[in-house]
Amino acid sequence: GALVQLVGEEFFTLLEATVREGLILKPYDRVYVGKDSRHEITYIIGRIGFDELTSAARVELQGVVERIVLNREPWFINFFNTAQAITPRMHALELIPGIGKKYMWQILNQREKTPYKNFEDLQKRADIPSPARLITKRILEEMSGESKYRLFTRAP
């Protein structure tokens, strides 16, 4: 079957796999890659690095990651509600592009009053731009190996 490149939904792991003969997958299709009864995927070739993505896969990656982030909104909201300092001078929230000290304090002060319910609530109360887009940017930085700390991805 055809060769496909996949993004895991939990740790944003990049995989290469073969598709069942006669099946055609499109970008954004969700497929099961677990041990038993895979319908679309016949064989997982293995994990790949960011630099091994095809140019077509790279073009789609941001949109695919953002969709995963939106689908896992409760998980990411929990991150904003519970994130702690990583070092005495650096808070996990500051590792997200676009969030510096000012936004970090707004997020922390607001979550102390009441935890955030969803991205919209976070965006309104902490007055930050699109949380899903900021998280997506962070995930892409981690995937491409640009960052020392990993908040959302597993090392290749």
Kindly give the residue locations of the regions a language model identified.
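Small-residue hinge/turn detector
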Residues: 100-101
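C-terminal extensions
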Residues: 67-95, 109-156
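Conserved hydrophobic/aromatic packing and binding residues within compact polymer-binding modules
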Residues: 104-107
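Structure-specific DNA junction-binding interface
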Residues: 1-70
